[in-house]
Structure formats: structure tokens, C-alpha cells
Design a protein with these regions (language model features):
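Short, small-residue-biased leader/transition segments that mark boundaries at the very start
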Residues: 2-9
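Extended beta-strand/beta-hairpin segments
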Residues: 10, 16-28, 86, 102
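A generic alpha-helix surface/boundary motif
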Residues: 29-34, 50, 66-68
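Helix-loop "lid/cap" segments that line or gate small-molecule binding pockets
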Residues: 35-39, 72
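Short amphipathic alpha-helical boundary/capping segments
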Residues: 39-45
Length: 111
């Protein structure tokens, strides 16, 4: 360690951050309820929410998320062209790394 303090490095060499406690089953259940409410159709319909979820999965580079939301999108009848448009928005906001992630994920899914 160089002794330079940054957000990613501990202040002292012998100081390690404490491990976060594991979430309780009640907390996980509440999070599951939140996820269900967030993805349920409302003022924004299910198709739009899945396209948003696809774009956010690309921005966050979350491959399991992208796989899940692509499957849900295709089940709703969303076309590859619509998914590509959502991906283009993700790339607009997240740049080249998002484009590379999307292309690689789609290549793997076609294999």
C-alpha cells in the first residue's frame, strides 16, 4: 500500500473493513415484495418495463439479469429490433463498455 488514502483503500494498512451482516430472511422477503411491485404492470405496461429492465441490465453489466429479462421480453412478444433499440439507449448512457457487454452477451446466447 502506498499510504495514499482513496475511497477504495483503507486508511490504515492494518484496518480491514468489517464484513456486512447477511440479510435476514425477512429482509429478503421484503426485497422480493418490492421487486414484484416494481415490475408489476401499472401506469407503465409490462412490455415497457421489460425493455427498461433490458436496458438497465446492460448498463449494470448484469448477465443473469439480462438473460432473465430477455426471456421475459421474448415471452411478451417483444422483438429483437425492439430489444436492440432498448440496448441502444443503454449504450447512449453507459458508453462503449455497455456496447461490448451487450454484443458479447448476445453472441453467447446465440451459441
Amino acid at each position: 500500500m502506498t499510504g495514499v488514502q482513496t475511497c477504495a483503500l483503507p486508511i490504515f494498512e492494518d484496518h480491514a473493513p468489517a464484513a456486512a451482516p447477511a440479510p435476514s430472511s425477512a429482509a429478503l422477503a421484503r426485497f422480493g415484495e418490492f421487486m414484484g411491485a416494481a415490475t408489476a404492470p401499472g401506469k407503465v405496461n409490462a412490455r415497457a418495463k421489460e425493455l427498461i429492465a433490458v436496458a438497465l441490465s446492460i448498463v449494470r453489466h448484469c448477465e443473469p439479469c439480462l438473460r432473465s429479462h430477455l426471456a421475459a421480453a421474448f415471452a411478451l412478444g417483444i422483438t429483437r429490433e425492439e430489444i436492440d433499440e432498448a440496448a441502444a439507449l443503454a449504450v447512449e448512457f453507459a458508453g462503449c463498455p455497455a456496447l461490448m457487454f451487450y454484443k458479447e452477451t448476445m453472441r453467447v446466447l446465440r451459441a
